């Protein structure tokens, strides 16, 4: 590689300072924050909105979120950790107090908010998985959720599913206290989600509509990654089959009405599961991911992509320099290195190559809904590509700014998103006889 090429790859640092990076395209005019922007830093804004959006399911409160936001120095990840952790710790202590006094509804709601804020506090720690705060904060966030789960009626069940020589955690949220066989939604998270958050964002909305709801941490996600050291794997059917095997043993599940719902990178995992399991009757991909490597490397200038394939050492050096001043991409790459068990930046990129549906998409036979958030960034264009190549009955819905639902995973517009997606599921599940 000559000096000119190396200078070109170093320019990647400038290219990574996207004004609309990671699902946000808020305007900043004359130094004032406009629209929904909560921080000048785009990733801080998106993650704060992610926490705040859980007010829809009573897993956040507006002023508590604003107290955290107000205490945070924009762009300072340590300040972010302290600001959200303070709220999480306060709510956890309050929940413990309520519980000891027998105020169980108040305890449950406070545990849920504590879990959300503690998860949020640890978000940027994923850029350094050796930071011990990751493990302590996640463990407390999960513990808070599990305590809340025990206070529902019916209780949210915590189940351990046998996986290889260990187990993976699953939550089963029943629609009712009886044993009536009901339609069941199995939700698969993405690159940085955990099962607790899936229940908060989607599970409570599902049971209102008479669906059972299942969420789990697969390898590379939540507890499986943070506390067990299990990493992402492309052959996700090896993960999903034990989950479905468990679900079909339950008397409260209608075996003909099992739907798989994947969000973010789950838009690859869920279709993969459906391609290998005919027991799944419906698929929702929010949004679809046809080829992870192609999508990820499309963010790179041509010289960088070429370098990735030909000179890993030079690519690593240039990328490390480029990431210094970009919080979002630095977090994404370093978290990816951790979740994919990749020793270097180049290895992370290259390890995404097998994550594609090229040879199996024709095996997806169930009716499929593809959800495309129009302001997504990492998987831009993937939903349309996935939709176009499907051979099964399919529909695609665009989530747009006019509905407030344009962000990835419809953060900030969960009520609207639930209406659209759950209505589609309800309509198609009702058409299935049995």
Where would I find each of the regions flagged by the language model?
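Catalytic histidine neighborhood in serine/cysteine hydrolases
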Residues: 390-405
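Conserved alpha/beta-hydrolase "acid-adjacent" motif
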Residues: 377-382
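Short beta-strand/loop motif that positions the catalytic acidic residue
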Residues: 364, 370-372
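Hydrolase active-site cap/lid region
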Residues: 275-343, 372
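Catalytic histidine-centered segment of alpha/beta-hydrolase-like enzymes
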Residues: 402-415
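Alpha/beta-hydrolase active-site loop
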Residues: 231-251
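N-terminal cap/lid segment of alpha/beta-hydrolase-fold proteins
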Residues: 84, 139-177
């Amino acid at each position: 590689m000559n000096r000119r090429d190396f200078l070109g790859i170093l320019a990647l640092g400038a290219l990574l300072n996207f004004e609309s990076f990671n699902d946000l395209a808020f305007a900043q005019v004359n130094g004032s924050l406009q629209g929904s922007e909560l921080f000048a830093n785009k990733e801080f804004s998106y993650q704060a909105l992610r926490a705040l959006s859980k007010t829809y399911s009573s897993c956040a409160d507006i002023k508590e979120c604003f107290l955290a936001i107000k205490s945070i120095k924009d762009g300072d990840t340590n300040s972010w950790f302290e600001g959200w952790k303070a709220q999480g710790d306060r709510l956890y202590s309050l929940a413990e107090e309520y519980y000891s006094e027998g105020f169980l509804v108040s305890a449950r709601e406070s545990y849920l908010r504590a879990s959300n804020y503690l998860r949020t506090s640890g978000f940027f720690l994923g850029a350094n998985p050796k930071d011990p705060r990751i493990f302590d904060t996640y463990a407390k966030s999960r513990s808070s959720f599990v305590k809340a789960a025990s206070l529902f009626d019916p209780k949210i069940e915590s189940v351990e599913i046998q996986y290889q020589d260990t187990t993976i955690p699953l939550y089963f949220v029943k629609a009712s206290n009886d044993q009536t066989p009901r339609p069941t939604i199995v939700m698969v998270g993405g690159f940085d989600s955990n099962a607790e958050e899936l229940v908060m964002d989607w599970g409570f909305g599902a049971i209102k509509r008479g669906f059972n709801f299942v969420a789990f941490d697969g390898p590379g996600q939540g507890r499986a990654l943070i506390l067990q050291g299990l990493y992402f794997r492309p052959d996700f059917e090896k993960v999903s089959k034990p989950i479905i095997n468990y679900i079909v043993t339950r008397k409260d599940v209608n075996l003909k009405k099992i739907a798989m719902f994947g969000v973010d990178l789950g838009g690859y995992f869920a279709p993969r599961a459906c391609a290998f399991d005919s027991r799944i009757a419906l698929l929702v991909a929010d949004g679809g991911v046809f080829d992870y490597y192609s999508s990820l490397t499309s963010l790179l200038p041509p010289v960088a992509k070429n370098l990735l394939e030909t000179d890993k050492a030079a690519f690593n050096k240039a990328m490390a320099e480029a990431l210094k001043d970009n919080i979002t991409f630095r977090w994404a790459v370093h978290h990816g290195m951790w979740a994919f068990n990749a020793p270097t930046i180049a290895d992370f990129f290259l390890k995404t190559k097998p994550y594609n549906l090229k040879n199996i998409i024709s095996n997806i036979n169930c009716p499929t809904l593809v959800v495309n958030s129009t302001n997504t960034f990492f998987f831009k264009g993937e939903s349309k590509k996935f939709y176009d190549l499907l051979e099964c009955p399919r529909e695609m819905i665009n989530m747009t700014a006019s509905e407030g639902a344009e962000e990835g995973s419809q953060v900030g517009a969960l009520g609207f998103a639930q209406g659209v997606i759950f209505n589609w599921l309800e309509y198609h599940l009702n058409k299935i006889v049995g």
